Amino acid sequence: MEKYIMALDQGTTSSRCILFNQRGEVCSVAQKEFTQVYPRTGWVEHRPMDIWSSQISVAAEAMAAIGAKAEDIDSIGITNQRETTIVWDKNTGEPVYNAIVWQCHRTADMIEQLKKDGFDSVIRKKTGLIPDAYFSATKIKWILDNVDGVRERAEAGSLLFGTVDTWIIWNLTKGRVHVTDYTNASRTMLFDIHNLCWDDEILTYFKIPKSMLPKVQASSSIFGHTEEGLLGGEILISGAAGDQQAALFGQCCFEPGEVKNTYGTGCFLLMNTGDTAIESQNGLLTTIAAGDAGHIEYALEGSVFVAGAAIQWLRDEQRMIKKASQSEEYAKEVEDTNGVYVVPAFTGLGAPYWNPYARGTIVGITRGFSKEHMIRATLESLAYQTVNVLHAMEQDSNISLKSLRVDGGASANNFLMQFQADVLNTLVYRPQCIETTALGAAYLAGLATGYFKDRNEIKDNWTLGGTFSPQMDEQKRKELLKGWKRAVRCALAWAEDIE
């Protein structure tokens, strides 16, 4: 039997396992959802044992589906929801509290205080991040400050912190290994991305004991072995990366200026910037990209809060479509939006505007406005928001975009991808294998063991599924983008206190 790479893909709503062969083809998939916990409005938690039990069960299931044994698995690569925070007892393995999920904003007041203290510039300079409750630092502090006896136990050295990758590796190795990779460390708001170390000044500010923190190493390197009894024998763990960085690697965006966009609930855009950590002047995050061969690479990251969620809104709240795929059919029934723009700022606007108080708007409505126009305008809004982030990336990097690689659920929408190419005036490439996040984790693991020879071999595996070339004339493109800017101004104006 040929050997496989096992990718453990631990997401926000489910745990998945995919077995890949040397050609980067999917050989087996297993998936299991787990319970979301909402203790209060705006709070989001996961039970750490649910994360672990679902992940190990799908690993066994994926192996069993094709009759694979431990000796048939070359190595394991892990990719995970980023920033989600777990604290546990290093002697018993028992979590002291539920995992606080990246979406949870219970610590927003800590961020406001941080800004009042003038500490936001320190965070920005050292971590590359714009201070936000999204990241791990304030979540750790909340657990230390609000769970009885936890701060004392942490200061005594008996507690450990980890992002989800760390928690999975710790359990796979039965507590022998407490480690993370550079990409996940770079999302904690505690890690100096320039000197590649946990930052003492930031730890002191948040009153977080350094003894809690994991060792940090390259995304493609040897992390340890699984405990023999878990999957029928020892398996090497040799890759780990946060989900968006794993997708950048899975899309083979290895050169500075190469960009991928994942069209999920929101959009996550990452641009490889090589060995240069660019400090954004346009509201983007500077982060560490997944690397191999012992060298560090950086990326610029921009987020669009609402993308696929806008299509869900058409389906669930507006009841204009019965399934997401119908949005393409309706959009193609009209030649344009009849001058209408939808700005889906349901939870504010992300990069490059960063206004949490902006609200969704529909502008330019006339009597001739139809359901089809509404659906088309909503789809087009995903492309316009992507243009805004990519233009910010071009300005920060001084690199002109040559093409965009796409993945995620909404990338299957051919109308959207063509419109994206048109308003961006750039080629859009969609790969045949859209499992780019798990594939990135598999590639990182396989490079560390020699299963994959080098990046060139991986590039050869990348197979084009579809190309979308710009077909819009320059004048029309400029007019549409000008209209979008006016529509965004309306969404931003809603946040202003106007008498």
From Swiss-Prot:
One Pfam family of this protein, by short name?
FGGY_C
Q: Which domain of life is it from?
A: Bacteria
Which EC class does it fall in?
transferase
- Residues binding ADP: 12, 16, 265, 308, 409, 413
**Statement: the UniProt record of this protein carries the keyword Transferase:** yes
CDD domains on file: FGGY_EcGK_like
Q: Which biological pathway?
A: Polyol metabolism; glycerol degradation via glycerol kinase pathway; sn-glycerol 3-phosphate from glycerol: step 1/1
Any one of the GO BP annotations? glycerol catabolic process
Binding residue positions for glycerol: 82-83, 134, 243-244
Q: Which SUPFAM superfamilies match?
A: Actin-like ATPase domain (SSF53067)
Task: List keywords of the entry alphabetically.
Answer: ATP-binding, Glycerol metabolism, Kinase, Nucleotide-binding, Transferase
- Which Gene Ontology MF annotations are present? ATP binding; glycerol kinase activity
Q: What is one GO cellular-component annotation here?
A: cytosol
- Is the keyword Nucleus assigned to this protein? no
What does the record give as EC number?
A: 2.7.1.30
Q: Which reaction does it catalyse?
A: glycerol + ATP = sn-glycerol 3-phosphate + ADP + H(+)
Family recorded in the similarity comment: Belongs to the FGGY kinase family.
- HAMAP family linked: Glycerol_kin
Task: Give the matching NCBIfam families.
Answer: glycerol_kin (TIGR01311), PRK00047.1 (NF000756)
* Oligomeric form and interacting partners: Homotetramer and homodimer (in equilibrium).
What PANTHER family does the entry give?
GLYCEROL KINASE, SUGAR KINASE
Name the UniProt record assigns to this protein: Glycerol kinase
Q: Which organism is it from?
A: Lachnoclostridium phytofermentans (strain ATCC 700394 / DSM 18823 / ISDg) (Clostridium phytofermentans)
